[in-house]
UniProtKB/Swiss-Prot annotation:
This is Immunoglobulin heavy variable 4-61. Coiled coil: none annotated. It comes from Homo sapiens. Immunoglobulins are composed of two identical heavy chains and two identical light chains; disulfide-linked. Residues 117-118 are annotated as: Complementarity-determining-3. It is found in: Secreted; Cell membrane. Residues 20-118 form the Ig-like domain. One of its GO terms (cellular component) is plasma membrane. The lineage of its organism: Eukaryota, Metazoa, Chordata, Craniata, Vertebrata. One of its GO terms (biological process) is immunoglobulin mediated immune response. Residues 45-54 are annotated as: Complementarity-determining-1. GO terms for molecular function: antigen binding. Pfam families: V-set (PF07686).
Amino acid sequence: MKHLWFFLLLVAAPRWVLSQVQLQESGPGLVKPSETLSLTCTVSGGSVSSGSYYWSWIRQPPGKGLEWIGYIYYSGSTNYNPSLKSRVTISVDTSKNQFSLKLSSVTAADTAVYYCAR
């Protein structure tokens, strides 16, 4: 029982510490092939202008693992997954405390659950 409690505390503590910052994705649920997927992530309880973090987009295709799409720093500098780089744009709007993802020319291979992350 002691081991179980230790495990639970170890897992739960980081979530409690970080719970003040929340990220909420918004955008269309469906996009037609060849169109552009546009998603926005709104940050609450923190600021995208914080110089301590990179703001990321990741996705998880059905039945597969997580795939990193890219990240942006508050200054606007970006880094993208090489396999998606030609189709991806990530931008930040510090006035709205948001960052956004645009993925152009989508195909069935882009079917996934998309997440924003810090």
